[in-house]
Amino acid sequence: MQLTELIETTVVGLGYELVDLERTGRGMLCIYIDQPAGIAIEDCEKVTRQLQHVLTVENIDYERLEVSSPGLDRPLKKLADFERFAGSEAVITLKKPLDGRKSYRGILHAPEGETIGLEFEGKEGAAMLDFTLADIDKARLVPKVDFRSRKQ
């Protein structure tokens, strides 16, 4: 079983989604997990403990294991991500320029089949960018941070 498959099976078995996996040259293994309700430190601890056990049993060599949430600027990698975050603001970087641009910022529309839509502000007002997962170099949510006090 490949490392990604092993980790994804473990993470999904615990009720989480594997968002991303990075392995650095210095033996560090970074795992990014999510779930609809969000991720708390206890979730990261739970996944870390289970992965440490699984990686030891499978004799996977690593120096350090880090499990965390994908953050406010979460990457979008799967069609299900675009479905889940439809209506959210995102930045999409295409592999090849379209109309002289590679980077677009706008509001995601729910995928229709394999086609994803992004409503953005063009030169002449609102415009729609249609693309597929194969067209994307990078896609991330735009963080929404509210610094207003919650007290009323």
From Swiss-Prot:
The primary site where this protein sits is: cytoplasm
Q: Which UniProt keywords apply?
A: Cytoplasm, Ribosome biogenesis
InterPro entries this protein is in? Answer: Ribosome_maturation_RimP, RimP_C, RimP_C_sf, RimP_N, RimP_N_sf
Give the subcellular location: Cytoplasm
CDD domains per the record? YlxS_C
Q: In its UniProt record, which GO terms are filed under biological process?
A: ribosomal small subunit assembly; translation
> Which Pfam family, giving just one, matches this sequence?
DUF150_C
Keyword check for Cytoplasm = yes
User: Cellular component per GO?
Assistant: cytosol
Gene3D superfamilies per the record?
Answer: Ribosome maturation factor RimP, C-terminal domain (2.30.30.180), RimP-like superfamily, N-terminal (3.30.300.70)
Sequence similarity: Belongs to the RimP family.
Please give the NCBIfam families that the UniProt record associates with this protein.
PRK00092.2-1
**Function of the molecule:** Required for maturation of 30S ribosomal subunits.
Q: Output the HAMAP family linked to this UniProt entry.
A: RimP
Annotated protein name in UniProt: Ribosome maturation factor RimP
